[in-house]
Amino acid sequence: MVTRRHKYPIGKISYIVIIKLLAILMVIVAFMSCHKPYEHKTVLCIPVYGQSLALGEEAERVTDFDSLAAYANGRIVTENLDHDFGHFDNDKKKLFVKRLVNYLKHSYELSIYKMAQELADAIENDTLICIFPGGQGATAISNLSKGTTPYERFMDNIKTAYEEATANGWEFIIPAICWMQGESDIVDYPKTDYHQMLKQIRKDMNADIKNITHQNVDIPFVCYQANSLTRAKKFHANQYDCRETYVPQTFVNLLNTDEHFWASGPTYPYACVGEKIHIDAQGQQAIGRLAARSVLGILKGTERIRGLIPTGVSTEGETIIVQFNTSGTPLVLDTIQVRKANHYGFSVINKENKDIANDIAIDSTTVRITCSENPTDSKVRYAVNGKYMKSGNQNGPRGNLRDASGNWCYQFDISTR
């Protein structure tokens, strides 16, 4: 019988195997040193929900996902508590395929990317910041409410994040939901009560999320403001009864009176892609910074951030005085970031559909509007203007009022009576 000779002696084979195993082990150790297992004890989950602006549509992404994954020692994560950013679909099968092939063609800039970075900078190192989007583009609030596919998918993602956290023995809490929806309810004229439906969806989410997470604290909404009035085909700025302002005015009313609503900011100060409806990446980041400020306020238990909104309207003869909550920072007029609007965005519309505003003057906390006639029973408005079908800070509905801290005034439509 012929005996096969080994290429290497047995001892040498063992030595080579050991060397290879050591090399593999060193690679694994090196990899793990770059991707340390989390030692964090708390997961703060702050997702965004709404329609196309919540999903960042058309906002060309400027956030690099590798950099986002590495930011703050990897503490910014998705609903799976990983760094697989940029994949979204309400269809689970489609989402699986997108993740499998790392499909990022429709991965846009989201406000929550910048929000998460701001929060990670301000919050302790033992805390993960969990972010993800939910909702559906071009969809009215009625089709995003409880029982709809987007709503249930959003709850599924929250449940996934909670289960991942608890499997690791970590505390999990949702301090707030970022709300970015309203454009479709402005332009499509649905026969619904937006004010009532927005309050209801927050109540539903609050109850459903607490049922998942078992947290005791309520979950407020951090609200932007949709400003796309001119995209509505029937919009006329001087129409006394202006249906299109009902949605943006809802945000002002709730920020004024409801403790469960906090402010980020309006969208009109930012450029819109093609001057249509979607704010660009810089606008998304700006909204994200404002949202982070409110989330931090919620976490710290500070006074509620309501944004720059009117808190009172009075008349003195032919002059209207509008009071604002300026939080100690004076009002200013800015025609650099936002192109100058007529009367800096203010108008006073009487029942004859005539703008009777003549001039405005500001001091640290109030705006005084001088009118051409007695303004009793008129509508005082801000940022209710713009060119037909245009949006954004150049030709869309806009105004030039902000405070010295950079908070832009919310669009509003208030009766003087």
Where are the predicted features?
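N-terminal hydrophobic alpha-helix used for membrane targeting or insertion
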Residues: 9, 24-25, 39
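Bacterial N-terminal signal peptides
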Residues: 18-30
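Cell-envelope and extracellular/periplasmic
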Residues: 38-417
